[in-house]
Amino acid sequence: MNYEKDIDNELNIETCEFDDSKEDYNHRAYEPTPYNVLDLLIESEFISENDFVVDMGCGKGRVGFYLADKVGCHVKGIEFDPDIYEKACENLASHIEHTNGDVQDIAINTDEINAKTTFQNISAENYEINDNENVFFFFNPFSAKILSKVLSNIENSFYNCNRDIKLVFYFPTLEYVGELMAHDMLDFVDEIDCSHLYKDSKGRECIMIFEII
């Protein structure tokens, strides 16, 4: 049995294949967050059906489809690469067809679709955060330099609309941790250990949860 492919098949999506075609200094290769890691996040109950999650660097949309399906929350995926974004849109079309019946002419602008999972083709640092978005998910999608700008945007959104905001980081790099510790508004909440999921643990297999105070 292959858990990754089994869940993809269950959701009628294709997210398993690695893609480094657009990797550069500021943008990491596409690598899907493992489903068993997302299971641990769901079990922690840090995310509820009332949350609106933004997946920064969403790739082909796995996080959005799975959280929307298992938790019932809304998820918006932000992806800078137009080719990978198009694959996320194709996954959305096949997922909706699988769950709701035949779908004709799915729009590339998925904001037009009445679905719990949507996608937007824009760089994360240029994305304008909406007041109802309160959970932000990261799996090292871009450089610490871009992360710094994104964090500032989230903090500004908090100033404009005070609300509970959580930031979720899977397998954060040392550069990410350093950037997070440099932002005084961020408060470390908890760490979910994921190392038992891997035979060759690197010691950073965890989910770190922060909130804005």
Identify the function of each model-found stretch:
Residues 133-146:
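A short SAM/SAH-binding and catalytic strip from SAM-dependent methyltransferases
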Residues 145-206:
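C-terminal substrate-binding/active-site "lid" region of AdoMet-derived donor-dependent transferases
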Residues 83-84:
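Conserved short alpha-helix immediately C-terminal to the canonical SAM/SAH-binding motif I
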Residues 1-48, 87-131:
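S-adenosyl-L-methionine
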Residues 74-79:
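Conserved SAM-binding motif I beta-strand of class I
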Residues 61-65:
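Glycine-rich SAM-binding Motif I of class I
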Residues 50-57:
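Conserved class I S-adenosyl-L-methionine
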